[in-house]
Amino acid sequence: MNQKRGVSDVLAFFYALWSFSALGRSSYEYLFKNPRPANLVPAHLSTFVGVLYIFIIVGLRRRSPRAWWITLGLLLVELSGVLLVGTIDVIWRPFPYATVWSNYGIGYFFMPLILPFLGLAWIVRRETRAAYGVLRRE
């Protein structure tokens, strides 16, 4: 197994696992939680997270400069989101029930907080940028 491919495969596996989890959570929330508009915000947020994770998986699997830039942006959106929602939830608790990013992903063993850091650390490496064609091989 190619080491460069191996790391992206492991990241893609975990993102797939968490996307199923986030979309499953949002489906449950849409079906069984009180459908008042204020109660739909956590469901919408969980759906957004699940779809975001799917796009990150696609970016991790493709190898092009465009895919690298898009994946970098998506990872930054994910990190910003989990930090923002996690902080708001700790300080204020605005949602009637938890989201994927509540308390920095405590319900998911903090993986929503850890994964973007791992993804960013991997994607900015020189070898990874070269594999995506962002950095010219010397």
Which role fits each region the language model picked out?
Residues M1-E138:
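Topology signature of small-to-medium multi-pass alpha-helical membrane proteins
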